[in-house]
């Protein structure tokens, strides 16, 4: 193992051991907590899965909120995400979630609360809205907040990764022993992992292309996500062959200089239009009009045996309430 990864791993192991032995304390909220997280840095579909889980909960008329750190935002204070806010204020993914749930349930949408201290964010939510189910965004390594159910999303290459800072792993693969369920596409080979929780939920991954986007268009595709190659592959799978591709770092907030770079690429590649992700459209902000025509692609997940999976979570809720 690389010395830097070994040093990082030693720190992670020490911290986990302190939680396991109760030398570091977990704080518990009044409402049950379901964590949605991963082993690697970014790119496993946590936001689409949280949307999917939210849809299932709303179908069962279960009240919930989402607690998120709000990665990349300018403040650390606790805030309820407002639909007319910006990624700089709330973080791109919390804002995306808030808008998604508001569109699904306009009359009384699930709230998304951001805060660096997610226990305090949860307390704030309970004081404001009463105890309810909390979905903890990116929570697997956030062990300071006690949870009742840990869901970990896996990517196809997770089993081949090494620890940070050389690789993408936040902690060793054996950390999966803490999880209650993993979520994976059929590409993920479960037997490649040294340990596995009892529940393995399979999902089907797909993208939704705008109807007005012609498959014959000369498309410039760009994105700022953790695994851009998956986005470009998805486009090709749906019959779109980009004439040019541009990538930016995950959660990137686009500047005027970035737009000029994209415009130059449009000209040199003779592209008819741009295609990007829903998250990138949000991070483009008011600059988006300079790239017209531009189309946004939404990633979606479909959970097989969704009712059975949700029943497992409901058992946890009922256990806490009983």
Curated annotation (Swiss-Prot):
Belongs to the LpxK family. One of its GO terms (molecular function) is ATP binding. Keywords: ATP-binding, Kinase, Lipid A biosynthesis, Lipid biosynthesis, Lipid metabolism, Nucleotide-binding, Transferase. GO terms for cellular component: plasma membrane. Transfers the gamma-phosphate of ATP to the 4'-position of a tetraacyldisaccharide 1-phosphate intermediate (termed DS-1-P) to form tetraacyldisaccharide 1,4'-bis-phosphate (lipid IVA). Its EC number is 2.7.1.130. It comes from Koribacter versatilis (strain Ellin345). GO terms for biological process: lipid A biosynthetic process; lipopolysaccharide core region biosynthetic process. Pathway: Glycolipid biosynthesis; lipid IV(A) biosynthesis; lipid IV(A) from (3R)-3-hydroxytetradecanoyl-[acyl-carrier-protein] and UDP-N-acetyl-alpha-D-glucosamine: step 6/6. ATP binds at residues 40-47. InterPro entries: LpxK, P-loop_NTPase. It catalyses: a lipid A disaccharide + ATP = a lipid IVA + ADP + H(+). This is Tetraacyldisaccharide 4'-kinase. The gene is lpxK. It comes from the Bacteria. HAMAP family: LpxK.
């Amino acid at each position: 193992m690389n010395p830097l990864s070994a040093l990082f791993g030693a720190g992670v192991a020490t911290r986990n051991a302190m939680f396991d032995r109760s030398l570091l304390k977990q704080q518990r909220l009044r409402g049950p907590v379901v964590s949605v997280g991963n082993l690697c840095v970014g790119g496993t579909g946590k936001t689409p899965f949280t949307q999917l889980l939210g849809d299932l909960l709303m179908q069962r008329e279960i009240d919930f909120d989402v607690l998120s750190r709000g990665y990349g935002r300018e403040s650390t204070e606790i805030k309820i995400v407002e639909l007319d806010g910006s990624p700089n204020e709330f973080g791109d993914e919390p804002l995306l979630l808030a808008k998604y749930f508001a569109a699904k349930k306009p009359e009384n949408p699930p709230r998304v609360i951001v805060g660096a201290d997610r226990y305090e964010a949860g307390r704030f939510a309970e004081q404001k809205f009463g105890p309810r189910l909390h979905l903890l965004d990116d929570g697997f390594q956030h062990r300071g907040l006690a949870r009742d159910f840990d869901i970990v999303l896996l990517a196809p290459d997770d089993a081949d990764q090494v620890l940070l800072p050389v690789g993408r792993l936040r902690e060793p693969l054996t950390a999966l022993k803490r999880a209650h369920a993993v979520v994976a596409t059929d590409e993920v080979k479960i037997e490649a992992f040294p340990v596995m929780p009892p529940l393995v939920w399979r999902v089907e991954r797909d993208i939704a292309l705008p109807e007005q986007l012609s498959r014959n268009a000369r498309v410039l595709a760009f994105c700022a996500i953790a695994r851009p190659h998956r986005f470009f592959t998805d486009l090709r799978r749906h019959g779109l062959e980009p004439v040019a591709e541009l990538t930016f770092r995950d959660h990137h907030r686009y500047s005027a200089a970035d737009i000029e770079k994209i415009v130059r690429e449009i000209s040199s590649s003779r592209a008819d239009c741009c295609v990007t992700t829903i998250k990138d459209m949000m991070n483009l902000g008011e600059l988006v009009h300079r790239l017209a025509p531009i189309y946004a692609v939404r990633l979606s997940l479909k959970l097989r045996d969704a009712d059975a999976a949700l029943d497992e979570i409901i058992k946890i809720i009922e256990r806490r309430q009983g």
